[in-house]
Amino acid sequence: MKSKNLLLVLSSLFLVGCGGRGETETPTEKPAEGVKDGVRVAYGLTGGNLTRAEINVKDGKVAAAHFGEFQVGASVLATANVAEASDAVFTIAGKYGNSYVAKYLNFNGDVYAGTLDAEGKTVTFKKGDTDLNAKIGALTAQDELASLYHTLENNFIYGSDAEGNDLGLTKQLNKASADSKYWPTKEGVLGWKGNTAKIEAALVGKDLSKDTVDKTASGATTGSFQTYIDLATKAFKGESLATVHYSRDMIEGREKNGHSMCFAQIELHFGADKKIKKAFINETDQFMTLAAKLTDEEAALFTDDEKLTVSTTVYAKNLSVAGELFTGSVLETAYQKEALGFSNAAVTAAKFTNSLDYFGSTLELAQSYYHAAMLHNINKVKADGTVVAPGTRGNRTATKAEKDNGYWNITDGSKDTVNNSRWKWNIAKVETALIGLDLSADIAATQGDDKIWSFGTVSTGASMTEAETFLALAKVAFSYLA
């Protein structure tokens, strides 16, 4: 990621978090020529697996690495559980028992019909003459692969009826998600998460423009080791022309920061001319107060000392964020719309009295919180860290771009929406308006009398205040372009 000097300069121009950033560090050695600091991503489609490598580069070396991955075969995307078996699914007999595949697959709004072969073994999905597996396999451009990845991550591919209505069947999970059971880690077996953790650790400190990463030394056992290394190298060098930035959704010093309790991700894909080809924006749904909220059933699992009550709402007193324990207290006055304040002396230190400011203080911490939320690594726990219930909504959503997330939903037809969500509608407008922009130019966000925001001369069509924020975040992401 970019040096703290650059980060401080950029934050003075637009934004980036809300707390102090600590001491400025001086690189101990000259960064590799041509390798720019920043956070970059790269995608690859190999053997029916869509992989995303996110690489933080600082002082010319890998500072952190994060991998995500989905299976993307059409039949896998349409897989249902035995408990979901009905007239809406095919039953396929196999060596280890029956498996179930939805008869229709809604692929981001397009409905593909499944056909079971004569042997009753294979389902082929088509829309007209378009075979879904062939369509997926033909994707090669980074922005195309990214679009598929984010569509999967946000649950817009699902088993449906012939009209495309969601049947509530199993949805494909990111292998990095806490909910994923793909190749589980167990005694003597690293599994997918264990292997990628080894690879991520082995990448740290490497200058991938010249250093090699040894599989044996890494401790990883996966046969796909080199695939991950090659993808990480592509992101490191900036060959993918794709960057990503994380931050609290706010602009420093602005009077109105209505989403300042949310953490945003903005991923940009560029053409050779460095103009934006595609943008993907998402943000977490509020902060720890929402994550700590207990259902009646969950509340019964905690003692009175392990709960907090505000008015008639009951919350877990303790939350685990990516394994770190945070303890809450009721605030006399809500802070950034948060009724509870959470802290952990070991990680927040005396400098931060509230974990919202802590996670908002650096790009790296905002990044870690966003990933914890998206991958369901935030949990309601006992004081000793024992997990009692997940810290996501009952429908397992944690971010606003996800299909079933209910943030700013309008269902009465009174306004234009995307998936009944005014937030998704506004964000789609902002993402579209960013396409074609050259952020090396001095482009300002301005709001007209009709409340619609423009980026320079481009009208976004969006009215949400945060449109201005996302242009500021896009400028930071642009600065990471190698």
Which ranges hold each PLM region?
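Non-catalytic terminal and connector segments of soluble metabolic enzymes
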Residues: P31-A32
